[in-house]
Amino acid sequence: MLKLSRSANLRLVQLPAARLSGNGAKLLTQRGFFTVTRLWQSNGKKPLSRVPVGGTPIKDNGKVREGSIEFSTGKAIALFLAVGGALSYFFNREKRRLETQKEAEANRGYGKPSLGGPFHLEDMYGNEFTEKNLLGKFSIIYFGFSNCPDICPDELDKLGLWLNTLSSKYGITLQPLFITCDPARDSPAVLKEYLSDFHPSILGLTGTFDEVKNACKKYRVYFSTPPNVKPGQDYLVDHSIFFYLMDPEGQFVDALGRNYDEKTGVDKIVEHVKSYVPAEQRAKQKEAWYSFLFK
């Protein structure tokens, strides 16, 4: 029989199989050997004491403190809440963006008003201006006339506020266009003088009566002048009052009426600009694994 050393905490003792007796206890004969395992208390340490993972025991009247465990749990909860909040914000924002994008996609496919198309006009500097000049940038178009007493000036002032806010707050630049509905009186020089009182980026467009009529027809703009007007006679032109937002592909996006103020108008334009996806990128999205999001 092997002798245990008191300096050891754990010893394996092997005894030959035999029949033992004493104090009424019996050890049945078994084939081979059996192992007896004992824990020996040494150096004042308690067996099976719990020690924090990666740390040292903290003693307080013989008990392990739970402060480190509670602190770790608190940090985990805070991290979980922070990550959860960030993910919730991200997914909600992406959901709104995708919904707007899907709506724009649907408008391209069906149900979109047939607005826009080929036209030929002249700007207030004498340069040719066609629908091709709308490509590559967002444009906003307003139809009016220089002798308009109140509505046109009010709408152009509002457009100036939109342009300033879009540029300074969102870094968005639009191409603002003013197309006259009164080509008989609004020559390039007249438009240049008239628009000098408004935002400097607004470009005036005019043309012959037939050219202006064609442009108005393409955008479904109603306008009329009094019959039998004599040269030099003062008159008013009745016309539709809308801003037409066009995307960089020259496609109609939205029409903003007089109900849009300096804040809601900006919000609507920003929404459309941020949700716009170029044609090449749209084609890639339809082929990607997540294409079901756009259906």
From Swiss-Prot:
Mind telling me which InterPro entries this protein's record contains? SCO1/SenC, Synth_of_cyt-c-oxidase_Sco1/2, Thioredoxin-like_sf
Q: Which domain of life is it from?
A: Eukaryota
Which cysteines form disulfides? none
**Gene3D superfamilies recorded:** Glutaredoxin
One GO term under biological process is: cellular response to oxidative stress
- Cited CDD domains: SCO (cd02968)
What role is this protein assigned? Required for the accumulation of subunits 1 and 2 of cytochrome c oxidase complex. Thought to play a role in either mitochondrial copper transport or insertion of copper into the active site of COX.
Additional comments on file? Present with 2550 molecules/cell in log phase SD medium.
What name goes with this protein? Protein SCO1, mitochondrial
**Native organism:** Saccharomyces cerevisiae (strain ATCC 204508 / S288c) (Baker's yeast)
